[in-house]
Amino acid sequence: MKIKLANPRGFCAGVDRAIEIVNRALDVFGAPIYVRHEVVHNRFVVEGLRTRGAVFVDELDEVPDGALVIFSAHGVSQEVRQEADARGLKVFDATCPLVTKVHMEVMRYSRDGRECILIGHAGHPEVEGTMGQYDSANGGAIYLVEDEEDVGRLIVNDPGNLAYVTQTTLSVDDTARVIDALRQTFPEIKGPRKDDICYATQNRQDAVKELAATCDVVLVVGSVNSSNSNRLRELAERMQTPAYLIDGAHEIQPDWFAGAASVGVTAGASAPEVLVQQVVQRLRELGGEAPAEIAGREENIVFSMPKELRIPAVNQS
């Protein structure tokens, strides 16, 4: 059985930065460090940080006075920021800069009194944070839609003064259909100059399409609460290729590969490469050949760290 590895796969720049912020905060300030929500949606990563002394909480009222808190990569609402400020908490913001870009768009629409539609999944932390950037005091409102059916049911106050933004980890194809529905329903709607779906989401979806087209089975390494990982599994399944979302090699079932000549492996943007390599090792134990990397789009984006957590340059003499 051939093993093919998607490229790119796994960690994106925003996830790398968020995890590094927690690790460096632990190095500099010591445990405990409080993190609002899972810093990224991956069980292996979260458990590793918890072992080092990170304490994951749902809300700020679980954070003691005077403690240090980190906001997750998914971002937080203005209300959460204001609560942290009011309590005098020391904050490091691990919000992905590409999520922050969407936040800035929403705040601009809010200031201008333009109504805004967010395309996203209800209940996802990124969606809650983005919705929470909109201040309706200027007379506008923000609405959430997930699919074309939601668009058909949507009633807005001012169709002539309307814009849309999107969650960064959506299915590219699904989102395009929702945007088409929005444009048909609200012909004057404005959109971002550049798509809000992030480069890593796009690249990983392109790569899994290639896997699904050439493999009999696809494995997606990622946790069940990871939006972008779920989209990868769904995309492979839509191409009529059996696909499984797994947290690690221990979840692999040998009967998935009955009659399969090839298996493709990819990983969501919050899944570390060590898990991919463990999956490959398990597949080889089940008779898989040495893995082959599929050519893909190179990624070299790096996001900067907060100043207090940057490693000082070594003096050259």
From Swiss-Prot:
Positions annotated to bind [4Fe-4S] cluster: C12, C96, C198
Stated name of the protein: 4-hydroxy-3-methylbut-2-enyl diphosphate reductase
Binding site for (2E)-4-hydroxy-3-methylbut-2-enyl diphosphate: H41, H74, H124, T168, S226, S227, N228, S270
Catalytic class of the enzyme: oxidoreductase
NCBIfam families reported for this sequence: ispH_lytB (TIGR00216), PRK01045.1-2 (NF002188), PRK01045.1-4 (NF002190)
CDD domains hit by this protein: lytB_ispH
Catalytic reactions on record: isopentenyl diphosphate + 2 oxidized [2Fe-2S]-[ferredoxin] + H2O = (2E)-4-hydroxy-3-methylbut-2-enyl diphosphate + 2 reduced [2Fe-2S]-[ferredoxin] + 2 H(+); dimethylallyl diphosphate + 2 oxidized [2Fe-2S]-[ferredoxin] + H2O = (2E)-4-hydroxy-3-methylbut-2-enyl diphosphate + 2 reduced [2Fe-2S]-[ferredoxin] + 2 H(+)
InterPro entries named in the record: LytB/IspH
Domain of life per record: Bacteria
Annotated active site: E126 (proton donor)
UniProt pathway: Isoprenoid biosynthesis; dimethylallyl diphosphate biosynthesis; dimethylallyl diphosphate from (2E)-4-hydroxy-3-methylbutenyl diphosphate: step 1/1; Isoprenoid biosynthesis; isopentenyl diphosphate biosynthesis via DXP pathway; isopentenyl diphosphate from 1-deoxy-D-xylulose 5-phosphate: step 6/6
